[in-house]
Amino acid sequence: MDERPWQKNYDNGVPFSIEYPPVPLFYFLEKAAEEHPDTPCTIFKGAKITYREMDAITDQLAAGLAEIGVKKGDRVGIYMPNTPQFIIAFFGILKAGGVAVATNPLYSAREIEHQVNDSGLEVMLVMSNFYKMIKEVQPKTKIRTVVVTNIKEGLPPILSFLFGLTKEKKGGFKVELSQGDIWMKDLIEKHKPGDRPKLDIGPDDVALFQYSGGTTGVSKGVIAVHRNLVANTLQIRYWMTNCNDGNEVTLMAIPLFHVYGLVAGMCFSVRAASSMVMIPNPRDIADVLESIQKYKASIYPGVPTMYNAINNHPDVKAKKYDLSTIKGCISGSAPLMLETKEKFEGLTGGKLVEGFGMSETPTATHCNPLFGKNPPGSIGLPLSDVDARIISLDDEVTVLGPGEIGELVVKGPQVMVGYHNMPTETANTLRDGWLYTGDIARMDEEGFFYIVDRKKELIKPGGYQVWPREVEEVLVTHPKVLEAGVAGVPDPYRGETVKAWLVLKSGETATEEEIKEFCADKLAKFKIPTHVEFRNELPKTTVGKILRRELVRQHKEAEAQKPA
């Protein structure tokens, strides 16, 4: 069999291998500023910052960070939603020689405390409405300086003025800084671009601590060096064969604190000198739709939940928006259903393809071709310079052939250096240059890969094996079902049994029996859910992954409260 059967299915123009320049990640920003100086880098509610301006501002911030004691290798936190300030903070940190640590704005004080202490960061750049939370956490950490920005600083003058009048205080954005803390605006304005520290920052210097989403337990700090991020940025750029540098508009709704938004959204856009339309709240579908139409967005990285929301929006059905400028979208983080893909492509005329990656490969390893085959259920082909194998679950070494199910292992220039402070986890995950993903998968004869499920989420009812994803994929084909989550729950007879949690489409009703009957000729008897629970929504990560373990926790809690 061909060693890399996937290469023959690459789109025309996608190289088998790429030459990666030995440069720091911010080289792409400097190059965009040089080649496309007047192209907007960010657009936020109408306010634009060009690539020339972004390069200069981030130089100034780097000088400011150096002034407050940030040295090469220091970890620096970012705690903000998708705004121009996030991008300024990220590249300012890298230019100062720092290591960016992006934090989820939805995290609790306990979760933030864990990240801050684990990473050892001492300086944090935050949006003002999160300042109070950081000050609560600060005494339990080594944070010494908080650099604060207000969302209105990224807005056009008139909107900034109106925001100050109507929403600033109510939204918690108006804050008084404690001694030792500083406004980001002041830190930038104190310096000229030429003040940036003169540092030797190379491809093997650490650029990012990316904390994994924690869908399978405690959040782990992935260490990525500049060459990892440079490589994946270029792999994605070369995959997007219909993209023209300096002429694209990226809708940045996918959160930047997540590695998918950070690399496939922001880094890709900077390399392509694409204008990023910043969407701080991805659930604000009206903002998403208006932004696509107003700014003629052409690239829209997202998750299935986002594309579904557009597909089912009443104003889209009523044809109130022109979405025809969309030409390329990569969907990640959750399975992309064929119905979602076909409907979205029909509405926009663009391409929507499923990709795959992890925090440990910041960010992508596989993607379906934009113009070639897209087999239903496939995560696609390994990207340029990525090797992938399916290995035996028994000995974790034997390479399996097409159609056989085992663990997906990958190797490529984007694979992380390791986990921070977790040598055992690192040794278990990285073996002889191969990353053991923990995902159960198969590869077909043509080199397309398919995820079967997470290794840790296998359900074993009475000794059988049930992969939750297989059951979920059947359930979402029911005409009344919008979303499905499946997991194993304790069962006194079988030890464990299959439970499904369903969200129905608007206005629909269904019964447990109806769902079980629907599954009867599509699944083996032991795979059919024993329990079906209908919900208004399912717990998810910020990028739309269903949290199966949270569903199980809620189930156990409810069972414990039942009378004996």
Predicted segments with their positions:
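AMP-binding/adenylate-forming catalytic core of the ANL superfamily
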Residues: 126, 300, 412, 417-418, ...
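Conserved AMP-binding/adenylation subdomain of ANL enzymes
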Residues: 230-249, 259-298, 313
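ANL superfamily adenylate-forming
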Residues: 7, 133-203, 314
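Conserved AMP-binding/adenylate-forming
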Residues: 248, 274, 279, 328-329, ...
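AMP-dependent adenylate-forming
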Residues: 4-7, 27-50
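Adenylate-forming
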Residues: 81, 126-136, 149-157, 254, ...
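Conserved adenylate-forming
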Residues: 65-70, 191-204, 209-252, 274, ...
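Conserved AMP-binding/adenylate-forming core of the ANL superfamily
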Residues: 21, 38-83, 87-91, 108-113
